[in-house]
């Protein structure tokens, strides 16, 4: 009897110890762990969809955020509205809202890092489009962070001026310190160059090679690398040439579509969020007339259609 009990005890222990391995192999219920390029593309297309809906102001500014930046600039005169709720005159009234941009941009960076570090498929056409877009999008987010949260870039002091915490892989426990601005700029440039290696041409991914080059031109301009800024700007202009005055006016005022020489735009799909943002921006901006000093900077010649295209006789 004791021998039988001993055998049963040993069998039970063996079963329990064997089960421990399976017990530790936990997979979260209700969540899909990406494996294929198609599954990783859903991570990326979430952000691309937000841009097209005009629901994300941190990557590509949507109408409401763009109008807000105009309110804080020096191009508009004091409000004509009886209420100042939606037509702020002073950036300090919204200064705390800028903090939201920081975690939002790093959230996009996190998703890009997940794709870059973990997607096994690197050879299929879809995988190349996904990787090229992820590299470009990550650098654009860091470029936006560099502009918003760091001192204006000066090459002479870039090694002594604080830049950004640089994260190149998904690690929830990582706490990177801030790099200097030169290191940040080099990190951004590396991402752009990696994006160009994939030569994305599928416009469904928004950030094609030409769009990446356009952002590179802006990045080089911001970091005062004038020679490279000119090189990349010329490359982009070959694909998106300047238009004649009438054609430009028609293209720039198109709603829910990207004009002929518009490189990238938000709010290109009709939806409730984007439509509300557009309506609010339109109703608010007409309450602030353009400053007379700005109007006087434009020519009155037929070839300069900026004045006629941007505001009316009441300067709105």
List each model region and its residues.
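Bacterial Sec-dependent N-terminal signal peptides
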Residues: 1-28
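Membrane-proximal, proline-rich intrinsically disordered regions
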Residues: 20-66, 233, 298-302, 306-309
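Short coil/turn linker motifs that delimit alpha-helical repeat modules in TPR/alpha-solenoid proteins
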Residues: 127, 181, 204-205
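Conserved, well-structured interaction surfaces
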Residues: 80-148, 194-200
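Elongated scaffold/linker segments in the mid-to-C-terminal portions of large proteins
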Residues: 44, 48, 80, 238-316
């Amino acid at each position: 009897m004791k021998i039988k009990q001993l055998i049963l005890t040993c069998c039970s222990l063996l079963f329990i110890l064997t089960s421990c391995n399976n017990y530790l192999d936990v997979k979260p219920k209700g969540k899909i762990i990406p494996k294929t390029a198609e599954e990783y593309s859903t991570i990326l297309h979430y952000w691309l969809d937000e841009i097209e809906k005009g629901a994300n102001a941190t990557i590509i500014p949507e109408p409401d955020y763009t109008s807000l930046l105009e309110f804080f600039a020096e191009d508009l005169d004091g409000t004509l509205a009886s209420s100042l709720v939606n037509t702020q005159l002073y950036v300090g009234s919204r200064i705390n809202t800028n903090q939201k941009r920081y975690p939002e941009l790093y959230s996009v960076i996190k998703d890009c890092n997940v794709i870059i570090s973990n997607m096994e498929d690197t050879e299929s056409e879809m995988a190349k489009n996904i990787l090229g877009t992820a590299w470009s999008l990550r650098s654009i987010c860091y470029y936006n962070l560099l502009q918003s949260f760091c001192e204006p870039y000066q090459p002479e002091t870039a090694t002594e001026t604080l830049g950004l915490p640089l994260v190149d892989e998904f690690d929830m426990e990582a706490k990177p310190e801030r790099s200097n601005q030169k290191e940040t700029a080099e990190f951004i440039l590396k991402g752009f160059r990696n994006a160009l290696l994939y030569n994305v041409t599928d416009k469904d991914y928004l950030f094609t090679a030409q769009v990446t080059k356009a952002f590179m031109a802006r990045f080089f301009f911001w970091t005062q690398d004038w020679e490279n800024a000119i090189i990349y700007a010329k490359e982009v202009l070959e694909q998106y040439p300047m238009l004649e005055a009438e054609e430009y006016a028609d293209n720039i005022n198109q709603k829910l579509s990207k004009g002929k020489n518009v490189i990238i735009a938000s709010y290109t799909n009709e939806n409730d969020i984007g439509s509300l943002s557009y309506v609010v921006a339109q109703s608010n901006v007409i309450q602030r007339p353009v400053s007379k000093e700005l109007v006087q900077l434009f020519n009155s010649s037929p070839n300069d259609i900026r004045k006629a295209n941007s505001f009316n006789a009441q300067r709105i």
